[in-house]
C-alpha cells in the first residue's frame, strides 16, 4: 500500500546515535504511550534502527550534517564541505533528542530502488490489492497463502507461501475526517491505509493488542502539515487565540496523570489534553507562533542564513506535505509575518508513530521478557494462544508463518520510518529461518480458488445483477456504493466512538449504540456494489475498515478507564486506573462465529522507567 513515506519526509524521527542507548529509547516509548508498551520490542528496535539509517544514507538519502566548526548544512552541501557519512562518524543535525533532519522528498524512491535491485523486478508484482489471507488446510493455526486482484487489469492472484509478511500500514478514514466536501481525502496519515493489516490478521486468527489505542495528532489546520520541525528545530511555541502558551497555562493538569505528565516531555495525548481545554473553554483558535520563532532566530543569524531558514520552513512541507504549502499560498500566509492555525485531527489507528495498536508478535529472547502468563485473569486468555512474549520467531504473530512489522506490530510505537524498516529486516530474517525450519511443510489452501474468486468478485456480481433496476446507477434499492457505505461508517464512529463530533468522548451507552449500528452496517456491506476495478478496491477497503473499527470499539468498551486522555475519554471511567488497568488489552476474532474474545495480558517493565524523572 502507498504509505506514510510515499509523499516524502523531512526528518527521520528515530535515530539513536551515540548520545542515547536502546534502553533510553524504550523508556521514551513507554512514557509517551502512557506506560503500556512492550520494552522487549522497543529495545530490540532501538538496537537495530541505526543500521537501517546507515543503509538509507549508503543508498543515497541526503542527511543533514553538523560540520566540525558547528555549521549546519543540508544533505546536498556536506559532501563538499568536509562532512562525513554517519557510519564514518558524521554528526547529524538533530531537530530533537531522537530526530535527524533529511532532504527526504525522494525517501521512498531511494529505499524502493534498493529493494528492486536486491529482489529483481521479475519477482515484484505491483498494483495487486491483497484482500484476504488464507489459512492452511492441514495444519491448524497456520497461514498458507493470500488472494488479491490487479487494480489495472481483470486478473485475480492467488498465492501460496510458507511465510507471509503483512505490512499494509495503519487505518485511516474510519472516523469522519475534518476535511470534507472539496477537502475529502485530505488526511494526516495516508488514506490508502484501510486497516487491512489488522483485519486480515484478525480473520486469519492472529491475536491483536491495544486496539483501543489511537493517535490524534495536532497539526497545521486543513493541510495537516507536520509540526515537528517547527517545535524542535525552529523552537516555536503553540498558543491560544490570546497568545498564551497553553502548555504553560495548563501545566498543573499534567499532575493529574503521574508519572506520564511529569516527564521532561509529557505523553503526546496529554499535550492534546491541554489543548482541548483551551478549545472547549472558548480560547481558540490555536496557533503555531511562527512569527516569534523566526524573529528569535534572526537575532543570531546572518541575512543569508535567515533566507535559508525561511526556505527550509517551506521545504519542510514540500518534502512531505505539499498540500500544506497550498494552504499557505491560498491564504496568503508568510510564516515570518502571520501565524498558522493548529487543530487536533480525527483519530487514526497505527503502530509506528505516537500510537501502539496492532498485532501481538513474538519478541527477542535475550532481554528478559516474560515466558509465561501470570496474573489474576490469566485463565481468560484463550488456551490455544502462546504464553509470554516470545515463541520462536521475531515478528511472528500468533499464527504460524504470519509475520508483520511497522504499523502491524502492536505495543511498540515511535518506530517511524527507520524503526519500521528495522522491524522489517528483523522479520525477514526470521521468516527465512522459519522456512528453513519448516522445509518439509507444503502449504495447501483451506479454501478452493473458485470460492476465493467468487467471494472477491461478489460486489461486481451485485452490480451486474441489479444495475438495470434504476435509471440512475448510483440510486438503487438493491445495492449501496462503497462511497456511501464509508460515510455511514465514519458517521457511526465519529458520533459514538469518540470522534471529533464529541471532543473524543464516549461511554458504555454510546458504544452499545455503535455496536448495534456496526452490526447493521456489516449486513448492508454485503450489498456493496463495484461497477469497476476502482470501486472493487474501495469495497474491499471498506470491509477491512469495518472490522478494524469494530476491534477499536470493542477494546475501548472492554478497557474501563481513559488510558489516553487527549486521544479519547470514557466519560463513565474518566481516569487512568493504574491499579486495575496497567495491562495489555488483547483480542482474537473467530471468522466462523464472527465473534470477538477480548482479554487482559500482564504488563511488565524490562527497563528502569525512573530515569525519566531524575
What is the role of each PLM region?
Residues 161-163, 167-168, 405-406:
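Short, well-ordered coil/turn residues at beta-beta hairpins
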Residues 436-531:
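Long, amphipathic alpha-helical stalk/connector segments used for oligomerization, subunit docking
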Residues 1-27, 228-230:
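Conserved N-terminal glycine-rich FAD pyrophosphate-binding loop of Rossmann-like flavoproteins
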Residues 153-163:
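Core beta-strand elements of the Rossmann-like FAD/NAD(P) dinucleotide-binding domain
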Residues 166-225, 417-430:
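Glycine-rich loop(s) and the adjacent beta-strand/alpha-helix scaffold that form part
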Residues 15-63, 203-210:
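Conserved FAD-binding subdomain of flavin-dependent enzymes
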Residues 59-144, 210-413, 495-614:
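Mobile, glycine/GP-rich and aromatic-enriched active-site lid/loop segments adjacent to catalytic centers
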Residues 391-460:
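Catalytic phosphate/nucleotide-handling subdomain of diverse soluble enzymes
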Amino acid at each position: 500500500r502507498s504509505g506514510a513515506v510515499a509523499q516524502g519526509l523531512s526528518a527521520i524521527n528515530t535515530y539513536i546515535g551515540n548520545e542515547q542507548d536502546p534502553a533510553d529509547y524504550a523508556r521514551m516509548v513507554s512514557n509517551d504511550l502512557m506506560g503500556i508498551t512492550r520494552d522487549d520490542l522497543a529495545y530490540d528496535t532501538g538496537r537495530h534502527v541505526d543500521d537501517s539509517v546507515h543503509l538509507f544514507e549508503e543508498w543515497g538519502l541526503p542527511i543533514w550534517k553538523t560540520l566540525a566548526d558547528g555549521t549546519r548544512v543540508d544533505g546536498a552541501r556536506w559532501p563538499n564541505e568536509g562532512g562525513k557519512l554517519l557510519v564514518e562518524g558524521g554528526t547529524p543535525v538533530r531537530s530533537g533528542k531522537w530526530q535527524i533532519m533529511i532532504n527526504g522528498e525522494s525517501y521512498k524512491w531511494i529505499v524502493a530502488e534498493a529493494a528492486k535491485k536486491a529482489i529483481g523486478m521479475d519477482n515484484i508484482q505491483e498494483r495487486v490489492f491483497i484482500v484476504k489471507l488464507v489459512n492452511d488446510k492441514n495444519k491448524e493455526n497456520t497461514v498458507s497463502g493470500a488472494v488479491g486482484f490487479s487494480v489495472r487489469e481483470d486478473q485475480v492472484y492467488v498465492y501460496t507461501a510458507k511465510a507471509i509478511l503483512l505490512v499494509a500500514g495503519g487505518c485511516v478514514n474510519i472516523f469522519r475526517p475534518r476535511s470534507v466536501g472539496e477537502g475529502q481525502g485530505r488526511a494526516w496519515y495516508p488514506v490508502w491505509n484501510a486497516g487491512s493489516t489488522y483485519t486480515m490478521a484478525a480473520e486469519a486468527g492472529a491475536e491483536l493488542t491495544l486496539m483501543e489505542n489511537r493517535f490524534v495528532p495536532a497539526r497545521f489546520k486543513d493541510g495537516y502539515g507536520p509540526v515537528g520541525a517547527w517545535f524542535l528545530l525552529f523552537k516555536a511555541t503553540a498558543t491560544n487565540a490570546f497568545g498564551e502558551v497553553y502548555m504553560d497555562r495548563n501545566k498543573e493538569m499534567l499532575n493529574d496523570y503521574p508519572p506520564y505528565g511529569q516527564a521532561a516531555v509529557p505523553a503526546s495525548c496529554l499535550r492534546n489534553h491541554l489543548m482541548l481545554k483551551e478549545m472547549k473553554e472558548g480560547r481558540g483558535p490555536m496557533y503555531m507562533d511562527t512569527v516569534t520563532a523566526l524573529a528569535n532566530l534572526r537575532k543570531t543569524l546572518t541575512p543569508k542564513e535567515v533566507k535559508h531558514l525561511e526556505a527550509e520552513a517551506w521545504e519542510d512541507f514540500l518534502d512531505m506535505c505539499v498540500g500544506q504549502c497550498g494552504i499557505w499560498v491560498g491564504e496568503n500566509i508568510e510564516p515570518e509575518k502571520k501565524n498558522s492555525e493548529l487543530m487536533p485531527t480525527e483519530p487514526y489507528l497505527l503502530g509506528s508513530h505516537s500510537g501502539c495498536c496492532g498485532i501481538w508478535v513474538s519478541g527477542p529472547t535475550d532481554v528478559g521478557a516474560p515466558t509465561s502468563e501470570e496474573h489474576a485473569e490469566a485463565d481468560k486468555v484463550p488456551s490455544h494462544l502462546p504464553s509470554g512474549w516470545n515463541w520462536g520467531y521475531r515478528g511472528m504473530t500468533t499464527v504460524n508463518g504470519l509475520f508483520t512489522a511497522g504499523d502491524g506490530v502492536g505495543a511498540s510505537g515511535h518506530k517511524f520510518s527507520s524503526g519500521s524498516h528495522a522491524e522489517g529486516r528483523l522479520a525477514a530474517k526470521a521468516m527465512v529461518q522459519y522456512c528453513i525450519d519448516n522445509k518439509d511443510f507444503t502449504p495447501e489452501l483451506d479454501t478452493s480458488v473458485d470460492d476465493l474468486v467468487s467471494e472477491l468478485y461478489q460486489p461486481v456480481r451485485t452490480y451486474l445483477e441489479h444495475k438495470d433496476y434504476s435509471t440512475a446507477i448510483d440510486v438503487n434499492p438493491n445495492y449501496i456504493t462503497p462511497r456511501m457505505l464509508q460515510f455511514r461508517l465514519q458517521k457511526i464512529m465519529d458520533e459514538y466512538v469518540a470522534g471529533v463530533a464529541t471532543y473524543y468522548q464516549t461511554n458504555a451507552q454510546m458504544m452499545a449504540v455503535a455496536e448495534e449500528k456496526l452490526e447493521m452496517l456489516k449486513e448492508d456491506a454485503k450489498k456493496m456494489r463495484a461497477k469497476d476495478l476502482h470501486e472493487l478496491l474501495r469495497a474491499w477497503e471498506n470491509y477491512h475498515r469495518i472490522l478494524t473499527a469494530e476491534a477499536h470499539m470493542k477494546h475501548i468498551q472492554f478497557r474501563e478507564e481513559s488510558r489516553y486522555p487527549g486521544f479519547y475519554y470514557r466519560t463513565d471511567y474518566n481516569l487512568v486506573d493504574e491499579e486495575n488497568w496497567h495491562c495489555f488489552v488483547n483480542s482474537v476474532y473467530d471468522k466462523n462465529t464472527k465473534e470477538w474474545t477480548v482479554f487482559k495480558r500482564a504488563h511488565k517493565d524490562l527497563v528502569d522507567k525512573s530515569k525519566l524523572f531524575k
